[in-house]
Amino acid sequence: RQLNPSSQELQSPQQSYLQQPYPQNPYL
């Protein structure tokens, strides 16, 4: 999540999901 800009997180939350563990992802 921290590696991607917030705009990209909104566009493709799956990327942040792949980059960081599931429990640590605030979007999930």
Curated annotation (Swiss-Prot):
<dbReference type="GO" id="GO:0045735">
    <property type="term" value="F:nutrient reservoir activity"/>
</dbReference>
<keyword id="KW-0758">Storage protein</keyword>
<comment type="function">
    <text>Sulfur-poor seed storage protein.</text>
</comment>
<protein>
    <recommendedName>
        <fullName>C-hordein</fullName>
    </recommendedName>
</protein>
<feature type="region of interest" description="Disordered">
    <location>
        <begin position="1"/>
        <end position="28"/>
    </location>
</feature>
<keyword id="KW-0708">Seed storage protein</keyword>
